[in-house]
């Protein structure tokens, strides 16, 4: 019969009883007392409930990227890049730019210059249904 390791003691599977399993779970719960989404009572019945329960995530920083274009090159070509090398991207001048949040495209926009700084004017939000629920 196979032996298993439970709480650093070798016990035969048949020797495990409900009390052993309960103790093991209690120890694991004390060590790993993190909660999963299922453990949290979201009770999202109204717009106010959602707002109050989601308030804590509103200050979480996200990484916003404006993608001018992409190019696929070999490692050999990458290693040969030098100052003044030019990479030809897959987009044309004037094409909408992708706006990504944490790597996911959420919108498109166009490049603008304001007060000698680059900016992006939002043209289209890809899917804002998540925001409408808040």
From Swiss-Prot:
Superkingdom of source: Bacteria
UniProt cross-references to Pfam families, sorted A to Z: FliMN_C (PF01052)
Intrachain disulfide bonds: none
GO biological process: bacterial-type flagellum-dependent cell motility; chemotaxis
GO cellular component, one term: plasma membrane
Family annotation (InterPro entries): FliN, FliN-like_C, FliN/MopA/SpaO, FliN_T3SS_HrcQb, SpoA-like_sf
Keyword Protein transport on entry: no
Membrane topology value: Peripheral membrane protein
Cell membrane keyword on record: yes
Functional description taken from the UniProt entry: FliN is one of three proteins (FliG, FliN, FliM) that form the rotor-mounted switch complex (C ring), located at the base of the basal body. This complex interacts with the CheY and CheZ chemotaxis proteins, in addition to contacting components of the motor that determine the direction of flagellar rotation.
Family: Belongs to the FliN/MopA/SpaO family.
Name listed for the protein in its UniProt record: Flagellar motor switch protein FliN
């Amino acid at each position: 019969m196979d032996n298993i390791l439970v709480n650093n003691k070798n016990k035969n599977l048949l020797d495990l009883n409900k009390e052993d399993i309960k103790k093991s779970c209690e120890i694991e719960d004390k060590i790993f007392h993190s909660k999963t989404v299922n453990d949290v009572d979201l009770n999202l019945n109204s717009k106010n409930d959602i707002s109050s329960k989601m308030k804590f995530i509103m200050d979480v920083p996200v990484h916003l990227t404006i993608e001018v274009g992409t190019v696929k090159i070999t490692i050999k070509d990458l290693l040969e890049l030098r100052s003044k090398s030019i990479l030809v991207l897959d987009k044309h001048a004037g094409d909408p730019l992708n706006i990504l949040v944490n790597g996911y495209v959420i919108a498109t926009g166009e490049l603008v210059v304001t007060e000698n700084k680059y900016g992006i004017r939002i043209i289209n939000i890809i899917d804002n249904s998540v925001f409408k629920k808040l």
